[in-house]
Amino acid sequence: MAIIYHRIPIRADKSKVFEAITTQEGFVQWWTSDCVVKPAVGFINEFRIGTEAHYRMKVILLQPGRAVEWKCLNQHDDWSGTQVSFVVTEKGEYTYLDMKQTGLSGENEEYGFINYQWGQYLASLKRFCEAGTKNEVGAAGSGVIAVTAARN
């Protein structure tokens, strides 16, 4: 099984970063406005990106102010059964976000694309947390949808 791992240094308060990865108000700023998100174990978060993607993520771990983990409930793609975790820590003037997606089938063409997508999403999260700039990666014309459409 393959793992995707990103460690992002963010010049923002730890609570702001944690809110951005656990609340609907946070996600609409950096991923997609078409989402339903709740920071509660057992809740199924839903994220839609145009007509190309619909992700269903069950919250399986929530450590307030520190970590959240999801299990992907999608039935039809390489994300099915994978787990995504976000861990937030502080060191000096930075808050670090460690993001992992585990359980991917392997390092193939799809793996490279998923890794690219996460890089785009997390860069958007960093911009939002540091500058307060809304940069919805899942918005029309964001590049991710164009890349997804180009793959079909």
Predicted regions and their residues:
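Alpha-helical scaffold segments that form or flank carboxylate-/histidine-based iron centers
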Residues: 13, 46-47, 113
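Hydrophobic pocket/interface hotspot
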Residues: 17-18, 27, 45, 59, ...
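Residues at helix-coil transition
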Residues: 22-23, 64, 123, 130
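Short, hydrophobic secondary-structure boundary micro-motifs
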Residues: 29-30, 39, 136-139
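A conserved amphipathic terminal alpha-helix motif
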Residues: 103-152
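Hydrophobic ligand-binding cavity/cleft-lining segments
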Residues: 1-36, 151-152
